[in-house]
Each structure stands twice: as structure tokens, then as C-alpha cells.
Amino acid sequence: MMIKPPLSLSRITSAVAFPAMIMAWAVAGLHLPAADLQGCRDERSYAVFDALFLQRNNASISRPVVVSSTAPSAAVLGAADPVSTIGTGARATYGSYGEEDLGWEVGYLGVYGMHAARAVSDPAGTLQAADPVFAQQTGLIDGFGAWMTNDSQINSLEANFVMHEYDGGFNRRSGRPWQRVDWYDGGHIDWLAGFRWANLYDTATLAIPPGASTTPSTYAAQATSNLFAAQLGTRGRLAFERWAFEGWMKIGIAGTALSQSQSLVDALSQTPFRRPTSSDTAGMGMIADMNLSAIYRLDDVWGLRVGYNLIWLTGVALAADQWDFSPNPAGGTALQGTGSVFLNGANLGLEARW
């Protein structure tokens, strides 16, 4: 079965390139007075809080979920059709560079309220689940309307060792052109190595009211994915009198613990065709995290942040992938764990460095 890619390469490239161009313009064109800033210094501790506004791009297995009984080979509604709303969340990081530029940091990331829905209708009442025999056995048949919902949330914790390299700040003789700019205040590169845990909780429901019934027959699935990753990354920062620019990239190879459960409710029968089932398995996956941010420096400690993010989880179990439309009462126990989730969107927050 084909996997629908989360985003085209051109869209991903554009999403990163646009904020980068804005930052380049800001560096070249903005030279604001900053008499209250002390000049070149290498802060030793930092705390960051960002509000997140991220949209999930579904990468479910591309397959029919709802068809018409008059054309059962053509999808009326596909598993990957619903488009998610923008989820809100938070990211918090605290760290210290230590005495010898060998430090640590801890962080949390959470994204909530990612909701997707898609509804279809047919005045002839021919809508049914993808397999006609399964549809007859479960009451997912003869629908004038059908809808699918998908809800998910992500939580992540990480702890990293940090190796810090500071460039010394303004230097008229430096071979780096940005260090020769009069209003340059200092830059650094951090090398990160650590551990990251991420949890994806995903639910999906298919509903079809059979015939004239006002109560829908439903097929619900829940999937949980825990990723335990060894993580490497790098973070760079350039600070000027009033503006600073920061970007990072982190990637972790993860072992995964996956589980799923599902249940059917037949509006036409009190005896379920298939009892609730569940299963679990282990596998491998990946966590990738990228950010590009601009910071307006309020004073020597505080700054306002705005930026753009890309987050990618692979090797996860997606709820819609767990639906088993086979006409087998013992079905619904196989776990599909090859899904991926791609998030992109903005961050807005506050930082302190001292």
C-alpha cells in the first residue's frame, strides 16, 4: 500500500527558506541604538519558553475508508483525506554552559488539540465501509452521510549534554564578516548529545448512520506510540545590538513501543460482529526537530522570540492505519507501525540569558 508523503520537498524548502530570508534582511538592514546593552559577553545560563502553533500533516496509509455501494472500487473518503487544524502547544528549555563550556540542558515540548475531520454525503444513501461484507456485518452501510474524525497530541522530554563554543564577539580582524560588523555582540555554536522521549496519542473514528437511523454505527481506534531516542544536534546563534538569530537541528534514532485498541458499535444489532481488540509491538523510528528564530533583545537578559519549526516523527502507529475492514470476526489485532507525523508552524515566546 502506498504511503502518502507528508509534504513535498519544495514546500519544506520554501518553509525554511522564507524565514531565513527575513532574518538575512533584518541582519543587513537593522542597526538600532542599544546603549543599555553591555556589549560582548558570553551568557552562561538560559531559559526559553515558546508558545507553539503547529499543523499536523497526515501521512496515513492511502486507502479507501468509505465507498459507494454502486462503485465499491472508488474511494468517497480516504484515510488521509482529513486536514488537521492548527494545534497549540508549548516548549520550555533550561540549560547551563558550566565552568568549562561543558554543560547541560533539559526541555519539554507539547502539542495539543490537533483535530481533523471530513464528512461526505450521498442523497441516494449508498455510502458504506470500504469492504461490502464488513459493512453488512457491522452496520456501516446504507449511509446518506459519513464522517471521519482524527485527534492527536504529542508530548516530549529531552536531556542533553552541551559543548559550547563562543566566538569572542566583535573582532575587526576576524575572517568572519559578521564579526567585523560594528554592532555585532557575539555568537556561539552548541553541540548537543542526549536522550529524548516522545509520545504520540492518536484517535480516529468512522461513523455512518445506516439508512434512516439517527444513531450512527461507529468504528473507533486508538493508537499510542512511545519513542526512546539517542539524540545528536547542533545549535547556532548570532547576537547583534538589538536582534539575535538562532537555529537548531536535532535528530534521534529511536526504539519504539507501540500499542493500539479498537471497537465497533453496530446501530442495527446488539450483538457486535467483532469484540474490542488490542495489540502492541516494538520497532524503530526517528525524531527530527528543526527551528529558526529571530529574537528582539529587550535588555541584557530578556528577549522576545518568533520563529518557524519543523518536527518529524517516524515509525509510529496512526489510529486510522489500524482499521481492519476484513470480514473476519478475529481481525483488528495486527498493528501497523510504519506511520509518520510531520508538524510545521510558528513559535512565539520569551527568553532569558544571564
Task: Explain the meaning of each model-derived region.
Residues 53-57, 110-114, 165, 195-201, ...:
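Transmembrane beta-strands of outer-membrane beta-barrel pores
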Residues 78-120, 156-158, 188-190, 196-199, ...:
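Glycine- and aromatic-enriched membrane insertion/assembly motifs of diderm outer-membrane
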Residues 31-110:
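Short glycine/proline- and aromatic-enriched beta-strand/turn motifs that initiate or cap beta-hairpins
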Residues 43-45, 100-104, 155, 185-191, ...:
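Outer-envelope beta-barrel architecture signal
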Residues 47-49, 94, 104-106, 191-195, ...:
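Membrane-embedded beta-strand positions of outer-membrane beta-barrel proteins
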Residues 53, 160-161, 340-354:
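Outer-membrane beta-barrel "beta-signal"
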Residues 96, 163-165, 236-238, 294-296, ...:
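Residue-level signature of outer-membrane beta-barrel architecture
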Residues 60-85, 113-154, 200-226, 256-285, ...:
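Extracellular/periplasm-exposed beta-strand and loop segments of Gram-negative cell-envelope proteins
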